[in-house]
């Protein structure tokens, strides 16, 4: 018997704001427990929420980038439940009138394009964090309470784990390049819940849904869905039935584990939030935000390949993060050759970042200085070997490349009036190499170049030396 899967995803993005959604408390990842809270976050009597309007702006950016319909009027609702990390005993979210509906993302899987619908996206506040100690006590940290979230709910349009993976990859890149979120799963600024059901092929009625929450990597999403497909198939083939339930993914075993069985849909007794008035989102404001929307990663890819002539692989490496793409764009705008800039970004810069476990914002290299260094290579002022020393200094201290080269006597020797006598002497002193060259041994010229480089302590222009050596050897 063949089965068909139906998969839906709910993705929470932490919006990149300086303060929380309903209070002026700052938002800083990794801050000491309960140091970024105030009376609103603690739900003290008499306190009222104040909406951070920047949350709407960031949400609208994502809505525009995913072809979603932005509702002209939106308001907040209360989702009622009790938990220690939720001091109000309700969460402020959007249930009846979300920010946007009816969007889509196009993905390509196994060479075929498919449109995945977005049911809705809504804004809500995050809850605090519970920590259970080994001493029998539990601790509550409310730094995260009130951090703004954008939840993007897909339609159940995905039919296998690979489609879900492709959807997540594309959604993550779209959100990242709008600047609405930094989408760092390791810091919790992107979290994924999945639901999956299977049914016999040809059956129209959907099967019973199983949820998996807070999956912390794309790989876990793919592996958990693949396992759950097989598990549900085995249950049905054995004559059993699927329970409406929530399961978690066990990374060590690669299996999903039952957490709780549901008897029906949860009743959170949603009702409109009485302390926040409905908000009207004007078309004028939407149009203004659309003008501010950064260029999408897909448009950038077209520019990199078709305008700058980069290889698709190099373009994709640059587009792994918005920071990398922005840095490259700024370097090219400052006059860097696009191909050389991409090569330096994808090798030396990324290598340094990976080796030192830092990001572009942590180092002192600027796009302008990278462009200056590339120009020094292009005009023959320094060799690629010297450039690596210049790069190390510029990354560490932000030193101007041109000044550093001049102050340290690193200017490449390209003067033919100086190099020609050296070339003639090296050729005269190495008759065996001349004979080897005439016999077609390419290594001979490499040896001679090495002798020149040794005499000049690496300052001779290798291209110029090669050219002069070839001319001299051909004349013998």
Swiss-Prot record:
Its EC number is 6.3.5.-. It catalyses: L-glutamyl-tRNA(Gln) + L-glutamine + ATP + H2O = L-glutaminyl-tRNA(Gln) + L-glutamate + ADP + phosphate + H(+); L-aspartyl-tRNA(Asn) + L-glutamine + ATP + H2O = L-asparaginyl-tRNA(Asn) + L-glutamate + ADP + phosphate + 2 H(+). One of its GO terms (biological process) is translation. Keywords: ATP-binding, Ligase, Nucleotide-binding, Protein biosynthesis. It is an enzyme of class 6 (ligase). InterPro entries: Asn/Gln-tRNA_amidoTrfase_suB/E, Asn/Gln-tRNA_Trfase_suB/E_cat, Asn/Gln_amidotransferase, Asn/Gln_tRNA_amidoTrase-B-like, GatB, GatB_C_1, GatB_Yqey_C_2, Gln-tRNA_amidoTrfase_suB_CS. GO terms for molecular function: asparaginyl-tRNA synthase (glutamine-hydrolyzing) activity; ATP binding; glutaminyl-tRNA synthase (glutamine-hydrolyzing) activity. Belongs to the GatB/GatE family. GatB subfamily. PANTHER family: GLUTAMYL-TRNA GLN AMIDOTRANSFERASE SUBUNIT B MITOCHONDRIAL AND PROKARYOTIC PET112-RELATED, GLUTAMYL-TRNA(GLN) AMIDOTRANSFERASE SUBUNIT B, MITOCHONDRIAL. Allows the formation of correctly charged Asn-tRNA(Asn) or Gln-tRNA(Gln) through the transamidation of misacylated Asp-tRNA(Asn) or Glu-tRNA(Gln) in organisms which lack either or both of asparaginyl-tRNA or glutaminyl-tRNA synthetases. The reaction takes place in the presence of glutamine and ATP through an activated phospho-Asp-tRNA(Asn) or phospho-Glu-tRNA(Gln). Heterotrimer of A, B and C subunits. This is Aspartyl/glutamyl-tRNA(Asn/Gln) amidotransferase subunit B. The gene is gatB.
